[in-house]
């Protein structure tokens, strides 16, 4: 599999790099569409913290890329009326990197760490006491003369986001007072997001066009917004000031994105499972090697959506293509391959 997949408009893991795309992010909870349970909880917790004039308890956000974890971290800081310091776990390479940030935080501010599962053990250990006691242990000197100095920190809120909760250590998870899990968005929720983004981008599109685009957005707002901008390009070149359902479908066909939001690399993955491994079960590492991808890319990007829409199952023995996958590819379904739509590993996104 070639790595031009990283340029695909349906790859949700890449962070927005365009100021116009960042401008689509809502700034308040009332403007954040979807994730209703998480919003209800956060609204209550934020109000309680403000009423007590305290920092919000530490918040752990779990979910696939592109669902709004970073956006919600910024919204939380905005709703609290405090600053938000943002970093990624890979940037916290040495203890002094973390110490420099923690000691510069203002009272009740938000410290957002993306990809928190990638923290080094030494950095995690520093965070334990910082999160629990708002203090920082710092070692001065070396060898027998070394001593530990405890530095007081202002009360703050750590917001950690991850796509791989299983890689976060139990001691770190236990220090988060609030844990929220993000779910894929429904087509109706995504259609509302597309219509909001269209208004902000001064794009005219009808409800049917918004829903058609939403159905191909992998349950992910970041993908929906990216596709909206690409479809706008098609409409502009076609000389149309209005985006219709016909233009959406023509644009998606040109981008090689099918009605389920699958691109060529998704189709190739399913075909490799079926044609090379008899539909599975096949291990993640073996499948990743066959595709020329890393196991992490397979698990973080491809699997969640394919499992959610019922094209793949993850079992103790490995990954399996479902009967629905065979049908989607127009292949005969083996008699032994039965579809279990109510399996806990599968969802009902579409």
Swiss-Prot record:
ATP binds at residues 24-25, 66, 69-71, 132-134, 175, 185, 222. It catalyses: ATP + H2O = ADP + phosphate + H(+). Residues 1-22 are annotated as: Disordered. Residues 259-350 are annotated as: Head domain (RuvB-H). Belongs to the RuvB family. Has 3 domains, the large (RuvB-L) and small ATPase (RuvB-S) domains and the C-terminal head (RuvB-H) domain. The head domain binds DNA, while the ATPase domains jointly bind ATP, ADP or are empty depending on the state of the subunit in the translocation cycle. During a single DNA translocation step the structure of each domain remains the same, but their relative positions change. This is Holliday junction branch migration complex subunit RuvB. It comes from Treponema pallidum (strain Nichols).
